[in-house]
Design a protein with these regions (language model features):
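A short acidic/small-residue loop/turn micro-motif
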Residues: 43, 167-169
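Accessory "access/gating" subregions that flank catalytic or transport cores
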Residues: 1-40, 116, 125, 138-139, ...
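Fold-independent oxyanion-binding glycine-rich loops
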Residues: 38-40, 155, 163-165, 183-184
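Internal maturation/activation junctions in enzymes
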Residues: 8, 58-165, 175-176
């Protein structure tokens, strides 16, 4: 919305005409706790999956090394599912009930992979018969997703660094008053 000194393409009319979509929170259990987070299109459900998988991967009285490996594996499994099944709920049906079900999480925690391998998404058909005919396709766009980091040092040795994690590189690619707008 900033117009000077570096005007962008976002206008005050864009902000005025923006329609907020309120979505209910989603919740899931982790041991004696109840985790509540944002619903899709945000990735909050992935955090519930991570904790559900971690609980199943992490044996009682495990060593620190085992706990850390369990947490990393839980994240990798949950994000493989997130990348495959999540999206904009206005456009696709996201099978959250199945992805967060105790039966699916228990079975998913048994999926093993080498540290150098990228885990694949899980198979939901055993947990929800209505999913059997549904096909999800991988994202084939050339866009790179992730965090953007810049480090700049000028001729006088002054340094500045910026890290932005807003879904894709530079988010919407719109700069407003010192930050990039998220494209999620």
């Amino acid at each position: 919305a900033a117009r000077a000194p570096n005007p962008g393409s976002l206008s005050l009319d864009d902000l005025k005409n923006y329609q907020v979509k309120e979505r209910p929170v989603i919740c899931g259990p982790y041991r004696v706790f109840k985790i509540c987070t944002t619903a899709p299109p945000s990735s909050g459900a992935a955090q519930i999956m991570v904790m559900g998988l971690y609980d199943r991967l992490n044996p009682d009285n495990a060593s620190l090394e085992t706990r850390l490996q369990s947490f990393v594996d839980a994240q990798r499994l949950a994000y493989a599912d997130r990348d495959h099944f999540f999206g904009d709920p206005d456009e696709i049906n996201i099978p959250l009930d199945t992805l967060l079900s105790p039966g699916y999480l228990k079975a998913r925690a048994l999926d093993r992979f080498e540290p150098s391998e990228k885990p694949t998404h899980g198979d939901l058909t055993a947990y929800d018969a209505s999913i059997s005919g549904v096909q999800w396709a991988p994202d084939t766009t050339d866009e790179m997703a992730g965090t953007t980091h810049l480090s700049i040092i000028d001729f006088e040795g002054n340094a500045v660094a910026m890290t932005a994690t807003v879904e894709g590189p530079f988010g919407t690619q719109r700069w407003a008053k010192g930050f990039f707008l998220n494209n999620e």
